[in-house]
A protein has these predicted regions:
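Short regulatory alpha-helical coupling segments
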Residues: 6-14, 32
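A short pre-motif secondary-structure segment
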Residues: 19-21
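Alpha-helical scaffold within the catalytic cores of cyclic-nucleotide enzymes
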Residues: 6-7, 38-59, 90
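Catalytic-core segments of nucleotide cyclases and related cyclic-nucleotide turnover enzymes
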Residues: 32, 40-43, 75-108
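PAS and PAS-like sensory/regulatory domains
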Residues: 65-69
Length: 109
């Protein structure tokens, strides 16, 4: 699953973006100079693209389920430290997970 997510994240990234694995099952995509609405749209496109993939047993083809992701989106501010930026993205991710999973949530205003 991690390989599928990482590959799809890289495929959907622009040349100026930086996709990365961040922690055990978490990924990050730094989108240079992207408007917030574009970042939100890209996150939802990624979520939809991954949901079209099914986990299958390689031996018998049995379907285990879809790949789902929860995404938190934050915008870097000029006054941000890396820690404050990541904290806002993590808070949005936590909200996505606790509000039903398989969704994209923007940072709190």
């Amino acid at each position: 699953v991690l390989k599928v997510v990482g590959t799809k994240l890289k495929q959907m990234s622009r040349d100026v973006d930086t996709p990365a694995r961040y922690g055990g099952e978490e990924f990050a995509l730094l989108m240079l100079n992207a408007p917030f609405d574009v970042a939100m749209r890209r996150a939802d496109q990624l979520r939809e693209a991954l949901a079209s993939n099914y986990l299958r047993n390689v031996t018998n083809g049995e379907i285990y389920g879809q790949i789902t992701v929860s995404v938190g989106v934050a915008k870097h501010r000029a006054t941000d430290s890396i820690e404050s930026f990541i904290a806002r993205a993590d808070a949005a991710l936590y909200e996505a997970k606790t509000s039903g999973r398989n969704r994209v949530v923007a940072e709190a205003a």
